[in-house]
Amino acid sequence: MKHTCLSLALAVATATATLALLPVSAAFAAAPAAAESSTAPVLVTAAQWQQMASDGARYPWFAKEQARNKAMLEKMMKAGIDVPFPKDKGGGRTHEQHKRNYQALLAAGTLYRLTGDSRYVDYARRMLLEYATLYPTLGPHPEGRGQIPGRVFWQVLNDSVWLVNAVQGYDAIRDALPAKDRQTIDDNVFRPMAEFLASEPKNFDQIHNHSTWAVAATGMTGYVLRDPELVEKSLRGSRKDDEFGFLRQVDLLFSPDGYYEEGPYYQRYALAPFLLFANAIERNEPQRRIFERRDGVLLKAVDVLVQTSYDGLFFPINDAILDKGVDTEELVAGIGIAYARSGDDRLLSVAEQQGRLLLTPEGLKVAQGLAAGKAKPFDYTPMLLRDGPDGDQGGLAILRMGGERGQALVQKDTMQGMGHGHFDKLNWLFYDNGQRVVTDYGSARFLNVEAKRGGIYLAENRSWAKQTIAHNTLVVDEKSHFNGDWKVGEEHAPTVRFFEAGKDTQVASATMRDAYPGVVFTRTQALLQHPELGLPVVLDLLQVSADKAARFDLPLHFNGHIVSTGFQAERFVDQRPVLGRENGYQHLWLDARSQAGSDPRTLAWLLDGRFYSYRFGSSAPSQALLVESGANDPEFNLRREPALVQRVDGQRAVSFFSVLEPHGEYNGTAEYVHGADSQIRDLKRARGSDAELVELTLASGARIALGVADDSSADVEHTVSVEGRSYRWRGSHARIDRAAGKGDAR
């Protein structure tokens, strides 16, 4: 998937309304070049252009954005027009030049509409006439990638992105062109580009973000060219049978809550074509009520995307790049469109964080809201986001305490996520103090770095990043979930058992079947506050049962510098063995290994001035392995990151249990340390006839227990005893606190 083009896509969408702040004749902007109904702008109407031209300069955010885009375009115009024959892969010269060109086309159309300066029309006209000469001569790209190479770019996705953006600029100048030039450009650039996309079912007729870009490009071009056939194909699929197309994608790719199947990273990427095309549909066919489809799921998706971030960065599940966040250009479009339609002032605070807007009617509304001081803080809240078109294919559980930079626990109980999905059912991540504490590797990729295979996904994305051992979840017999076959994974989703989001207690639980033949595992995690603990702690219980004895590995990938290991282990200092041969194990160095034992152990590390104590145990004897990624990596494609692996051998059932405690402060500048010692004295797990319980003992002797029933649907009473202390509760789960010295608890 090529995000480099996308970035520019929105950069120029920002340009499509970007240059409005120059001194301008509103009257001229409203009626450029004697527009006719067959050539007048349809993606942004003449009346909307007029309002931006007359009002935009009064609003600082709009004015700043216009000035930025004007400077960008003038620099490109000064450099001259360059429409090279395509020959390079991603990151190469011709690839990057064609990206700059669609930026320029979009910006030129915007500037013309907002200033009336005919230089911008002439610049875009001359560039498009060069494309009209070039495009009919192009076959498959010489560096073609994937089943369907592009024409202008090495993968067809980039051709779609080019068209989405360039057609917006063309729409703005089309009525200002001589009829002969307009016909030449229609017939030799935009129509054949759209027809090429629509003629490739392996790209066009799919339920996938690549197809979203293709149908959006085709449909927007159809509106501009007044071609209802292109519009219908884009909405209903190339055969116009409603099996594919934009409407089907809206119905299948989002859950009722607005969660996108491939995860936040690709939700970000897909939002741009979804919302830009939806806006075009609304302008041209409002009777379709596209923004009301499925109870407004497209606008829900904008809110969900912000919710699936921490301190400005998206949760990096599945194929994701760690530094993508809410300031991404795709979401700039989303925030503008969502705010214009909803008036939700929380979105203005996100726009402030983004530091920019689009020069569109929607961007103008954002600028007006910001100028009026309407921005309200965005409320990041705990929530369960259902997955699947009907909301019954698992979900993403988000537990939060302490505000935007406080504690956030993410339990990934979602669908596979198609080809970009990782094999990590019931995986989890944890954030605290503005940092990634329990981590997900994301993808193995250097976006736009030509030296790293042109910026595409590296071989290590398959051999490491997608593999189960690269995540914080159960591995059986050193194999990945579904044996590493995502198509099998698509057929099996976790079952959400329960979700609770209280003030001091937040709990998520899910069960996974069929990730391995004959294996069922259930994970229950809680974020718990207590007056004697300075910060919330994470309690984790993972229960496994199998129909035959197996090796069970449970990794914990963490971020920080190890302070202490509370267990005896053999250290490999003279040589560094590799943990295994395949399925990601070949990329792990083994640094230390304990003997098998049943007593809980501890591991502590330091991250950004805060200590983290991890106390862990299992119901069967386990080894503790300290490992680091980066083995068998001759091209240095992998980051070196530590992990702890709990290993249980030769068992049919086991329960892993742990608590992660943030605490204390280290200040190297002021040379002090506070609260370096854990406030948790003991961790125990016990089993009743139909339930399990994990008990924490604090330094004062007070206890916190979490009881979890085997059957989450039954409203019956459960009893579990821990060293003579009985805990009773009714229902799926319960938190039970007990002061120091107290007896049985209910």
Where are the regions a protein language model picked out?
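Aromatic-lined, polymer-binding surfaces characteristic
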Residues: 41, 46-57, 62-65, 77, ...
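Cleaved targeting-peptide boundary
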Residues: 30-40
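Non-catalytic terminal regions with compositionally biased, polar/charged low complexity
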Residues: 644-654, 660-746
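Short alpha-helical hairpin
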Residues: 64-86
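Short, hydrophobic/aromatic-enriched beta-strand segments in well-ordered soluble domains
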Residues: 556, 613-631, 654-666
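Extracellular polysaccharide-recognition and catalytic grooves
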Residues: 186-425, 429-436, 570-584, 588-608, ...
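Catalytic and substrate-binding regions of extracellular carbohydrate-active enzymes
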Residues: 356-575, 652, 662-665
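Gram-negative bacterial Sec-dependent N-terminal signal peptides
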Residues: 2-28
